Amino acid sequence: MKRVLFTLLVGLSFHVQAQLVDEMKDESRLYAETKQINQFIRRFNGEEDEKGERYYATDKQYRNLKLRKKYLEILFDRSNTGISNDLKTQFVKDVLEKKEPPILDFHGGNWFAEVQATFNANGKDQPITLFMELEKHHLGTRWTIYKVHADMYNDSFKRDTVVVGKFLHPMSHELDFMNLRKAFLNKDSVTQYVSKKFTPDHLSVFLYESKKGSIKYKSVEQVKFHFFQIPGWYFELAEFNRPGYNNGWLISNLVKLSAPGDEAILRRYVHHEN
């Protein structure tokens, strides 16, 4: 009887220990995971402790450089081999070793969301990317759509640069532009009569088709954020849901902006602008 009781006690002890270990792992994972964008910003700035409790300007640890270094080292997607350790080290150094270390500011501009969504267009599911930014609204702020990209619109804006002879004569005004008729005879050649300075605007077409009812929203597939707030740097933020501690909202891309025009080029690339 004693042997049976001893066996039961040992088994129960191992079970309790295993349960405690599992709970500790879950707790550590919870603290390691950056669950929200606001939490990412606070951790980047050194404005919360390991348990997610906020620090305020009156707290000793508020924006502490050692705390920031600790967080910065775990805020990268470690599975992305495209971000070298040297680049990460240089980024962390640039952030922390300046006279006034830069911080992320939720209301500071120079960051925006990329929302990859699915819409139904004329009975067919189509991917459409919405670019969104914060703007002031009354006493607060709100998210607004400021750009749109949809592959299905590309053909509508293509201009055939090989075709010659399709133009309106410079004296057309003397004929009250009666020759405009030929510009609209063929719908595929209308773009030949448009100014070279014209820039395709997918957002206008998107709004027109939304109001007309020819496209209908279905779902959001993925969300990313693009940050240009740190001088000389750009980084992309994406969400990762997977086993382990390297989880949640993490830096998924990092680029050093060395030349004066790098930021403008990168913004055009992100926005799918040629």
What residue ranges belong to the model's regions?
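Bacterial Sec-dependent N-terminal signal peptides
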Residues: M1-Y31
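Residue-level detector of intrinsically disordered/flexible regions characterized by low predicted structural confidence
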Residues: V4, K218-V220
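Core segments of small alpha/beta cavity-forming domains
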Residues: L20-F91, S156-E209
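Long, acidic/polar, low-complexity amphipathic helices and coiled-coil-like
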Residues: K25-G46, F106-K158
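Short N-terminal edge-element motif at the start of the domain
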Residues: Y55-G140
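Short, exposed beta-strand/loop patches in secreted or surface proteins that constitute
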Residues: L104-F106, K216-K218, F240-R242
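Short beta-strand edge/turn micro-motifs at domain boundaries
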Residues: D125-K182, D188-S189, K224-N274
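Long, ordered, amphipathic alpha-helical scaffolds
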Residues: G213, V220-Q222
